[in-house]
Each structure stands twice: as C-alpha cells, then as structure tokens.
Amino acid sequence: MDYKSAGVDVEAGRAFVQRIKASVEATHRPEVVGGLGGFGGLMRLPTGLRKPLLVSGTDGVGTKLELAQNHHCHHGVGIDLVAMCVNDVITSGAAPLFFLDYMATGALSPAAMAEVVEGIADGCRQSGCALLGGETAEMPGFYPQGRYDLAGFCVAVVEEDDLIDGRSISPGDQIIGIASSGVHSNGFSLVRKVLEKAGINENSQYGPDNRRLLNDLLAPTTLYASLVQELLSNAIKIHGMAHITGGGLPENLPRCLPEGMTAKIEAEAWPRSPLFQWLQSAGAIPERDLWHTFNMGIGFCLVVPKEAEQTALDVCHLNNHQAWVIGEVLKTPPGEHSALQGLPS
C-alpha cells in the first residue's frame, strides 16, 4: 500500500503546481519577493507609506460551489472567492496587497483546480493584488470525489490618516448603490431549493429576454476594488462604504453607520432585476426574506456628502458601473431601533 492507493496523488499535485505557475506569477506586483513554491510568500510594503495599517479579511463562496461544480463552472467561483474577500477589506479605503487561497478536495482534478486558480488569478489582477500563495489539500474520505471547498484570505493597506470607518457620516449624507452582477455569492442555499422546486435544467430560460438562468445565477461576483481606488484618486470624500452580502441591505448597510444614525432607502430608485423577480415568483419567497437574503441588485454602497454625490456617480458610470442614489442618512430618533427605513422589516 502507498499514498496514491490511499487516495492522495503527490505527482498529480506537483504537476498541478507547474500548471498554475504562470497564472499565479502574472498577478505579482513589484513588491513581491521570490516566486511560487516557498514555505511562505514574501512581499514588501509599498513605498511612501507613513503610517500604514494592514487590513485583513477572509471568506468563502458558500453553497454556490455546489451549483457551479454540478455544471462544471470553475473559473467563475475563483473570481467569487477573491471578490468576497477583497470587497470586504476595501470598505476601509484600503488597497489590496496580496491574496492567499485554500482549496480542499476529495481527489485532485488538475483541470478543474487549474480553472479555479485561473479564476482566482483573474480576480487578483482585476483587484491589483498579488496571488502570493495557497494550499491545495487532497482529503479522500473526507470530501466526496470530485467535490472541493474554497477559502480565501486577503491583506490590504491604508494610511491610518485616510482610514474610512464611518465616523464622519452625518445626517443628510447620500447613499449611492452600485450595481451587482446578480446574486453574487450569498443566498445559494435558498437558490438551490428554488431550482429544485422549479425543476430547472441547465438550458432553462427566464425573463422577458429568455436569458439562460444558470448563466446569470453563476455570474461572478462584481469586484469593486479598482472603482474604489478611482473614486479615492479623484479626491471624492467617502464617509463610509458597505459590501452587500448575506443579510442584504438591511443587515450590511447599518454596519458602516455610526451609533445614532440610520438610513432611509428608496427601493424604487433602481430597477429590480428580473433574476430576483424570478426567484421570488418561483420560490414563493416573502418580500422580507428576499431583502434579508439577497443583495437585490446592489452589491456595494458608498456614503458621501451631498456635494460629492454627482461626481461619485459620474466616476462610477465612467468606470462601467451602474450606480444610483438610493437613500439618505438620518438621525435616529431617541429610543428608536436603528433599522433601515423604507425596506420590509
């Protein structure tokens, strides 16, 4: 008996590393020291920083992986993994530095795993961060053969004096919602139940334009890092930012608001996607659950002073991101719960 007969193919693992090497190294920034294969990734801090703060984040892709693996769509979930981490850390105004990934699988499929890593590398390039390293664990008997799970880890940097933490938010500030590409990477346990109930197959279509349902459900999560850096480089004063993930607007936007503040959201300020309309209809999902599960077409929010509203919108549109003013910051009445106004409670 040997390791391979026990389910772990070391030679396939080595071949996999060689296969992904070019994709990984294509993400490297000038600050990266050394190459792939060391025990730890090395990277210098960018020059010119006076009081740098490191910002870290970690996340996964959730049960979207089940749907993606069932339909052999591996590249997109690599982008999802980067987006779920990067979109969190940039809410502080930080610029992504590097990314690490962890993949666990029942049996290494070099082709599928390479697609995932190429997606991760794609997401890193879009975000300006280096894919500094990773781990692929082959775990036969723990994961079913052909199945894998993903985790990502991102580190970003921001000048301490430029940190965006919501403390400068005040009543009258405007909330700009930036479009999502669809469901992103949250709510897929519910999505999968809806698909099961509706008897969907890989060719099923929906909506007035007869779009392919699975294509839209598996669309990669939008990356907002380059847009945020563009907004900041245009000296737009951003008071707060929120990544709209699990829990939707009602649970994520308040995370960037200081105590004593809430927001009134105008739910008609942006068009409701036919994808969410289909999910609600096919799954008989109550309106409140819809808003508390999905992003409802808004993947990221900016909180800006009134005078910065139009400039911020212009920068979003110039960078090919749809965006709308979707609400306003209000002072919370004494003794009143700070839940968002204007959305199903």
Curated annotation (Swiss-Prot):
Q: Which reactions are catalysed by this chain? A: 2-formamido-N(1)-(5-O-phospho-beta-D-ribosyl)acetamidine + ATP = 5-amino-1-(5-phospho-beta-D-ribosyl)imidazole + ADP + phosphate + H(+)
Q: What are the record's GO terms for cellular component? A: cytosol
Query: Which GO BP terms sit in this record?
Result: 'de novo' IMP biosynthetic process; adenine biosynthetic process
Which Gene3D superfamilies does the annotation name? PurM-like C-terminal domain (3.90.650.10), PurM-like, N-terminal domain (3.30.1330.10)
Q: Name one Pfam family in it.
A: AIRS
Task: Indicate whether Membrane appears among the record's keywords.
Answer: no
The UniProt similarity line reads:
Belongs to the AIR synthase family.
Q: What is this protein called?
A: Phosphoribosylformylglycinamidine cyclo-ligase
Its gene name is purM
